[in-house]
């Protein structure tokens, strides 16, 4: 029983350490893409994400499973383009 509780607690803690979002480039903007997921998947995995894809409607890479220390784009704190 104790082992089961330990496993469940471990899974919950692992989930807390990951986030999803649009990674930012050096200028604070989303990483742009047009078509295909290979570029975004590579960019996201370089940031230690589990995967990434090109969200075509936003023309930007979206990463899943990013570490907490990676900054992601947020419309509320958008500094892209000197805003």
Curated annotation (Swiss-Prot):
Source taxon at top rank: Eukaryota
Alphabetized UniProt keyword annotations: Amidation, Disulfide bond, Ion channel impairing toxin, Neurotoxin, Secreted, Signal, Toxin, Voltage-gated sodium channel impairing toxin
Modified residues (Glycine amide): 81
Tissue: Expressed by the venom gland.
Gene Ontology biological process terms from the UniProt entry: defense response
Disulfide bonds: 29-80, 33-54, 40-61, 44-63
A GO cellular-component term linked to this record: extracellular region
PROSITE patterns found in the cross-reference section: LCN_CSAB
The keyword GTP-binding appears for this protein: no
A Pfam family matched in the record: Toxin_3
GO molecular function: sodium channel inhibitor activity; toxin activity
SMART domains referenced in this protein's UniProt entry, alphabetically: Knot1
Domain LCN-type CS-alpha/beta: 19-81
Signal sequence bounds: 1-18
Major localisation: secreted
Subcellular location: Secreted
Free-text comment on this protein's domains from its UniProt entry: Has the structural arrangement of an alpha-helix connected to antiparallel beta-sheets by disulfide bonds (CS-alpha/beta).
Known role: Beta toxins bind voltage-independently at site-4 of sodium channels (Nav) and shift the voltage of activation toward more negative potentials thereby affecting sodium channel activation and promoting spontaneous and repetitive firing.
Similarity annotation: Belongs to the long (4 C-C) scorpion toxin superfamily. Sodium channel inhibitor family. Beta subfamily.
Annotated protein name in UniProt: Beta-toxin Ct25
Species: Centruroides tecomanus (Scorpion)
């Amino acid at each position: 029983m104790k082992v089961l509780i330990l496993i469940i607690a471990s899974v919950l803690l692992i989930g807390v350490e990951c986030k999803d979002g649009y990674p930012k480039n050096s200028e604070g903007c989303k990483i742009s893409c047009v078509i295909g997921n290979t570029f975004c998947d590579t960019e996201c995995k370089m940031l230690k994400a589990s995967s990434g894809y090109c969200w075509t409607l936003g023309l930007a890479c979206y990463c899943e499973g990013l570490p907490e220390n990676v900054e992601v784009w947020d419309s509320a704190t958008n500094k892209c383009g000197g805003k």
